[in-house]
Amino acid sequence: MTTTIAITSGKGGVGKTTIAVNLALSLTLQKKETLLLDADLGMANAHILLGINPKHSLDDFINGDLELTKVITTTKNNLKFVSGGNAINNLLNLSDLERHKIIKSFNDITKKPEFMIIDIGAGAEASSMTFMASADKVIVVLTGEPTSFIDAYTLIKTSFLDYKMNNFGIIVNLSNSPLQAKLNFDKFQSITHKFLDVNLKYLGHIPTSQKIKNSIISRSAIITSESQSPEANAFNEISSKLLLVETNKTGSIKFFDN
């Protein structure tokens, strides 16, 4: 049985991809078979943090050049990875049929992973929402900035009203302290609960860190380059809580027939 977890955000620049990559690697290092799908279509860059340059991507699959299993790359840490590619015009303008083809194709994988982490494009674009609704669990990354609050709220509102999603995990990124992060979550939850009947689960925070910035510059993930650091421990702690997020029952097609 595969648990699919979408990592998303209301706006870009909040560290969503960094979190998705490090959580996927954290699970892999715990000996959990994990697949990372970069579904930030046309703007895919998770491979940069992994320090790899995949030969193939979803673009090859969509064009009919390769089967999905042929575009899966295995990293040196044994993480399975599917690149979203950088053919912006092709990937940003996918039809509903093409998006559904991508989703249903994952069921053809012979050896199903225990977890699939999906790096979703920021915001409430159609392609992002389709992949979100097809995941079992959704995690929203936000920061303490007012614009991040507004955009995250808008994303959750759209997910709830248009796609019947009502369960969301929340990660506060770029925080100055655990206390400040929790206060930011409490404030966001209070605002959200005034208008939407949704469940928000606080999973933890990732601190503002020069080490994380350096790891991005050096094309590496801090979970592997600084495995004993407080930052790596923060990712490990969050990865241990992923299953605490309730599953959404959207009625949408799913990546795997569990």
Where are these regions (language model features)?
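Walker A/P-loop phosphate-binding motif and the immediately C-terminal alpha-helix
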Residues: 3-40
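G-domain G4 guanine-recognition motif of GTPases
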Residues: 10, 143, 168-182, 205-212
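Gly/Ala-rich phosphate-binding loop of Rossmann-like dinucleotide-binding domains
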Residues: 28, 132, 160
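P-loop/Walker-type NTP enzyme "switch/lid" segment
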Residues: 37-111, 216-218
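Inter-motif core of Ras-like GTPase G domains
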Residues: 108-111, 125-146
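Anionic-ligand binding region
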Residues: 146-168, 178, 183-184, 188-191
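Beta-strand-loop-alpha "switch" segments that mediate conformational coupling across diverse proteins
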Residues: 195-223, 235
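NTP-binding/hydrolysis catalytic cores, primarily Walker-type P-loop NTPases
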Residues: 217-258
